[in-house]
Amino acid sequence: TPDILHAFLQHGGRAAFELRAVLAATLSPTWGIYSGYELCENTPLREGSEEYLDSEKYQLRPRDWDTADTIAPLITKLNTIRRRHPALQRLRNLRFHHADNDAVLVFSKRAGQDTVLVVVNLDPHHTQEATVSLDMPQLGRDRDESLSVHDELTGETYAWGTHNYVRLEPGRAPAHVFHVQAAPASPQIGGSPAS
């Protein structure tokens, strides 16, 4: 249920809320958040409890939305990405890809010509690095094809192939949400921005 405050959120800080928002917004065609999630509210009723200290089950809780430290800009961006990509509006098109680090999750969703590739750091405390190996046919591409991937969160564009290096730092880049595009005329394979 959305009103459960799991230990991951209690101790993971803002980065835990960010990575969970990315996962929820991209794995499923529908998503929602509990009031206060965008403010990263994570105070439990008592140590070891999964219940919020100021649960709305028992009271109305006023919040100062204008001065709060919030992940609302990330949530707004995720909603914009979801509207822009039909692949994220489908349920049965989820495909997982390999990363050589268990703290990095990689998956794609494809609908017609629209393909979205998501790479998420599951560790809210530490920077994680991995080599991501793409199942190119699952992306609708030839095995040796080069790709241009545009990160919808940062605006950066990379040239990717079958094997790619990623580095995701909590608080800076919780994930990549890539729009997979046709490769540039002279691709440079690797993790450096192409533009």
Per-region residue spans from a language model:
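Carbohydrate-interacting/catalytic domains
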Residues: 7-12, 17-20, 27-28, 33, ...
